[in-house]
From Swiss-Prot:
Modified residues (N6-acetyllysine): 440
Organism: Macaca fascicularis (Crab-eating macaque)
Gene assigned in the entry: TAF1B
Superkingdom, taxonomy of origin: Eukaryota
Lineage: Eukaryota, Metazoa, Chordata, Craniata, Vertebrata
Record protein name field: TATA box-binding protein-associated factor RNA polymerase I subunit B
Keywords from the named record: Acetylation, DNA-binding, Metal-binding, Nucleus, Transcription, Transcription regulation, Zinc, Zinc-finger
Amino acid sequence: MDLEEAEEFKERCSQCAAVSWGLTDEGKYYCTSCHNVTERSQEVINTDLIPNTQIKALNRGLKKKNNSEKGWDWYVCEGFQNILCQQAEALKNLGIGPELKNDVLHNFWKRYLQKSKQAYCKNPVYTTGRKPTVLEDNRSHSDWASEPELLSDVSCPPFLESGAESQSDIHTRKPFPISKASQSETSVCSGSLGGVEYSQRKEKGIVKMTVPQTLAFCYLSLLWQREAITLSDLLRFVEEDHIPYINAFQHFPEQMKLYGRDRGIFGIESWPDYEDIYKKTIEVGTFLDLPRFPDITEDCYLHPNILCMKYLMEVNLPDEMHNLTCHVVKMTGMGEVDFLTFDPIAKMAKTVKYDVQAVAIIVVVLKLLFLLDDNLEWSLSNLAEKHNEKNKKDKPWFDFRKWYQIMKKAFDEKKQKWEEARAKYLWKSEKPLYYSFVDKPVAYKKREMVVNLQKQFSTLVDSTATAGKKSPSSFQFNWTEEDTDRTCFHGHSLQGVLKEKGQSLLTKNSLYWLSTQKFCRCYCTHVTTYEESNYSLSYQFILNLFSFLLRIKTSLLHEEVSLVEKKLFEKKYSVTKKKSRSKKARRH
């Protein structure tokens, strides 16, 4: 279609009366406003071939679409492969070693392609009519050491480049050596081969790949490498655009055309949810039949002792609390290697929510020290305030009220900025998705109008330039002793809430209330329920603060706190259970 060549045609459109024409591949004029195609063709005068002769109504004839319009023949799995490659590169830029991309994620993806019968098998499911047979070689799926031999390159080259290949080579070469597609495969319903079939495919026992599943693959790879990134960190980096996720398809090579059913496959219009990605991680790990992951030991970043220290620093709590969190970890057995290590082939495959668990332990310690009943914490704050006024040269006691006031102000400011950033986020991609090539001009025109309106609106609302993407950081709050505007509580003492008894320290508070008195049945979809009105304001604030840090629902953190308490006060729960059983027996 050539708009410049159609400028000479000045007649009005019979449908919409507009004078805006373009040329089809057959040489006929069409209206760019309503897409009405006329019977008129372009008049071409060519005096070079036939002297003194005017040629009218020259039909250029049907011609094969050029490569720039049609693009490559590509499969859906190649699209997800490209997204995984983008995410792996982003993690590499964040400081993760290249082994995650070249070794771990590479092998996980190859294993998925084989187990889902899309590649690395004799007859890939999208290239022939019959179902392929996965190459077993009479070996166990869990034999990870023999996996490179098990995966023979039948229909798909390696996902990641070798040392000799550059990153640019991946985007310039055609990833899959695919034979000429049939008419049904190159349907206008999808830009990818088999896009319609993929969107309708429902096969029992097969984990269907989606864009959120790519984050599950990334987290599995990080967990295998025991990298210093938790699931909440990963999702926050996605939210801050450090890791491609929303509109990741716009970074596909130009030759990979997306339209039709590809919209539903690669288009994402919501932020990734912690619980959803967590479940998908277990689902993918189980489907791939992966062996037991490397042990999570005490020197590993994901161990609760290290994560507790990290989050204590994050929320400006005293360093002395770390001894108490370590004690809770030891008493509950949550620091044991077998408890922390992910084993997908175990009977009940599950992995620990490392970040949520660490935060829940801190909440339990705060309840042990201050009770958080909207009464005792303020009484202890009065004692700490009086002591600090009398002993200004000594190490200050931790004042819960002062900490609450400072943290609430910082939390409200941070949350407001976060909500504003979410409200201003541009969901529409720079590369619009459309259903067919007929809709392409309309889609790009709409996109152009949206961009212009956004520029005008931003000029009217805020004349200041929009801040650029902030650099990635493991911490969202920064507290230093040099900050004169905000008090740093890291070096404050817990003497006001602890008392000595022999060689040990005990809490002055001898009371404790359980977050959950009775857990839900095993067939229920949740462990416990959370209603804010049933709990103290102090407890609500603590949960809201940590939930914001991890970008999780408050109910999820409350559930984890209840599970920590169940392990810590196991005897108390068992006594309660026996009493309830005895009451039932008396009734009968």
